[in-house]
């Protein structure tokens, strides 16, 4: 690659500032057919999960990169309104209450988010 296109960092998902504060961003899976990753943000903190609702094993969103987030605390599944906490992915209301999203380990370095798996 040339100097204008630096080699990408392994595991790079997105920049923290790509995610609306209090919102979510979808990162496509590297492998075709695999679920993507949803990254949620509150201020300088972020958490990542597989974009799969534990209720019916379907994506949390209807449309690409369109998520319902409330008060920078909860992420809602667009299909059956299950509500998941940002910080641990735990469903606190809805048809899969008590279940949790599958966490993706991440790290934040200089406002960039990397997959830590």
Residue locations for each model-derived region?
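Short cysteine clusters
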Residues: 53, 77-80
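A short acidic, glycine-rich active-site loop
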Residues: 74
């Amino acid at each position: 690659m040339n100097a204008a296109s630096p080699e990408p960092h392994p595991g790079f998902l997105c920049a923290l500032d790509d995610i609306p504060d209090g919102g979510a961003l979808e990162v496509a899976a590297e492998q075709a057919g695999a679920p993507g990753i949803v990254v949620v943000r509150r201020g300088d903190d972020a958490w990542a999960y597989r974009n799969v609702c534990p209720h019916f094993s379907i994506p949390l969103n209807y449309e690409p990169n369109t998520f319902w987030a409330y008060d920078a605390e909860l992420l809602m599944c667009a299909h059956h309104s299950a509500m998941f906490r940002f910080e641990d992915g735990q469903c606190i209301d809805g048809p899969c209450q008590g279940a949790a999203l599958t966490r993706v380990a991440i790290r934040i370095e200089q406002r960039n988010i990397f997959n830590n798996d």
